[in-house]
Amino acid sequence: MNLNLKKWYSTGTPWIWLTAGAVAISIVMVLGLLVLLTVRGMNHFWPKDVMQAHYAPPNAQQEITITQVIGEFVESENIIAQQIISSGIPVDESQPEYRRELLKLGNRDLTGADFSWVLTDFISDVEYPANLVVLERREWGNFYGYLQSVSEAGTVVAEVNIDEVQDDSAWDEFTARLERALALHDEIYKIENQDIGEINYRVERLRLQQRRLELDGRATADALADIAAQRQDLETEYEVLQVSLIDLYEQVNRDTATFIAANAQEKVIELADVVRAYRPNQMGLGAKLLGYGAKLGEF
């Protein structure tokens, strides 16, 4: 028996099975990680519906101020009454627990806060308007609001007709100009991060080449003149790219859009600052899957 076992070990078969098992476990772990990322990403990247509601909690003076909230539901939890009272909201202590919801309100440049807890008992008039817009911006995070108008160099070129619920002309104008701005931004990115980077790399190569000639004692007048000529050509290319950048920035900063956020706050947003715009409350499953895939791909 021991002889057979030793012979089996000597063939290397156990190590083959051990290696195969380790590879199988690694594959399962990788697949599990991908599934975990997909599930977690579903919550982060999925285009969620955006609600609009009125929120009217009492204050310490028993006064009620009604505010409008617009945002995405994130999570909810139960909280004891005493904790709510200690935060300055007088609630009925005879009710042991209250439900509260965490909303992503965005509009950080207007309110200073991206998220806020609200007590479910004081929320009313919840609705999901079809024309609510979500903007993903390069700065300040998400913006939530209603499109009012689109302007070119300060002149309004499209405006929402409040009497026509199904009128999407302003939205179509906005999305067309946003696509233009995104294309221009891609050109700017290419020049700044690729073309100019390539020039800087070549300039550095010339500097090292000149230094090598000097160390080797081969820095003749002709060699230095050749390097200087190449450096001048690169400077000319750089100046041409700078002129192109100035023109592209003027073009990309041309268009703006005016939005109305919660509580009738007006906000003018440059289309150059927008990465993506969509109206989630009127998106079907297919459109949301495409949006999810695009965001996941960027990640």
What are these regions, as identified by a protein language model?
Residues 1-20, 27-32, 39-299:
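Membrane-topology segments of multi-pass transport proteins
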